[in-house]
């Protein structure tokens, strides 16, 4: 891994200041993966999102409706964390698949084994009235093959729009991965929100979380066009290929790899029910508790490549401009 000096990670898609055309040989790279990496990715993003709502006074007294929640192992950590902080939260976890038994027997957690449609969403809204709802969606349908097609994605995003329209949540975190240019079908709409990037996503994943806080007005929609799709692909490939493969040398932490740097900036915003001498001590405590919960071993920084000059990532693309390829990034998860 090469080294770099950075002040902060890219937290949101709009902050990515460079792009790179996809290189087909990337598909042959052996991906480095942690145990339970998918649960770790979800846990960090949702802990960051819910802590933000806590900071704004939105979380306490809410019902979290999580659609597409199974297996949901990580949700037990979230539930326990906010319960120990004295937050009064109810959880409704809905999925056609079964949940991890670790979620059984909790009075504040309702498990529903079914898929949602418009009629069921209306029944949820009626059942929970007048509670304020926080919506988390991780819906993912695949009608064939190993990865969702563009038709699958458009169906999922239409369903997420219906969720917002019917449930009228105070805030939402939605699954968002732009279709690939060579699989384009038509323009479509998604809710307006901040496109949060995810540490520990698969190596070439183009998935983000779409975070929104609603202030009473009607849901604002953003149109996604084919030119947007090309922009998404190039920026996410730059992030995954260049940025996420760096070691941040000015980051004083046991593991200086970029994803840990990204995680640090997420966890520093999280409230704890104990005091720490430094922000680093708090983040280490949180990381260790999360990794212990998910049975993820602690790792040190991967061996870095020799680089005589440590420099910040340039805002200008230093790669060749003649690397166009018709092949798309295939990190769907």
UniProtKB/Swiss-Prot annotation:
CC annotations in GO: virion component
Alphabetical list of CDD domains matching this protein: capping_2-OMTase_Poxviridae
Compartments, as annotated in UniProt: Virion
Disulfide bonds: none
Biased composition range(s): Basic residues: 323-333
Region (Binding to NPH-I): 169-249
Gene3D superfamilies, per the entry: Vaccinia Virus protein VP39 (3.40.50.150)
Record: residues binding S-adenosyl-L-methionine: 39, 66, 68, 72, 95, 97, 116, 138
Function in brief: Displays methyltransferase, positive regulation of the poly(A) polymerase and transcription elongation activities. Involved in the modification of both mRNA ends and in intermediate and late gene positive transcription elongation. At the mRNAs 5' end, methylates the ribose 2' OH group of the first transcribed nucleotide, thereby producing a 2'-O-methylpurine cap. At the 3' end, functions as a processivity factor which stimulates the activity of the viral poly(A) polymerase OPG063 that creates mRNA's poly(A) tail.
Protein name from the UniProt record: Cap-specific mRNA (nucleoside-2'-O-)-methyltransferase
Source organism per UniProt: Vaccinia virus (strain Copenhagen) (VACV)
């Amino acid at each position: 891994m090469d080294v770099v000096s950075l002040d902060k990670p890219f937290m949101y898609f709009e902050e990515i200041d460079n792009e790179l055309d996809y290189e087909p040989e990337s598909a042959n790279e052996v991906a480095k993966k942690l145990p339970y990496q998918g649960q770790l990715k979800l846990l960090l993003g949702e802990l960051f999102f819910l802590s933000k709502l806590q900071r704004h006074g939105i979380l306490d007294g809410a019902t979290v409706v999580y659609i597409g929640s199974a297996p949901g192992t990580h949700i037990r950590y979230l539930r326990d964390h906010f319960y120990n902080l004295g937050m009064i939260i109810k959880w409704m976890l809905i999925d056609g698949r079964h949940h991890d038994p670790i979620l059984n027997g909790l009075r504040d957690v309702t498990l529903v084994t079914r898929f949602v449609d418009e009629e069921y969403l209306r029944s949820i809204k009626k059942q929970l009235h007048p509670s304020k709802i926080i919506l988390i969606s991780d819906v993912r349908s695949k009608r064939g093959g190993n990865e969702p097609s563009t038709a699958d994605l458009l169906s999922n995003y239409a369903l997420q729009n219906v969720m917002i329209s019917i449930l009228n949540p105070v805030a939402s975190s939605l699954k968002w991965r732009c279709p690939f240019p060579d699989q384009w079908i038509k323009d479509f709409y998604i809710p307006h929100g901040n496109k949060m990037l995810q540490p520990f996503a698969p190596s070439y994943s183009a998935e983000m979380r779409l975070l929104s806080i609603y202030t009473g007005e009607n849901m604002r929609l953003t149109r996604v066009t084919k030119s947007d799709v090309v922009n998404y692909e190039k920026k996410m490939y730059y992030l995954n290929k260049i940025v996420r493969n760096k070691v941040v040398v000015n980051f004083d932490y046991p593991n200086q790899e970029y994803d840990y740097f990204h995680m640090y900036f997420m966890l520093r915003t999280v409230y704890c029910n104990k005091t720490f001498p430094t922000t680093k001590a708090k983040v280490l405590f949180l990381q260790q508790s999360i990794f212990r919960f998910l049975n993820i071993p602690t790792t040190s920084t991967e061996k870095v490549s020799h680089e005589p000059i440590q420099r910040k990532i340039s805002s200008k693309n230093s790669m060749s401009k003649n690397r166009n390829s018709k092949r798309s990034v295939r990190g769907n998860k």
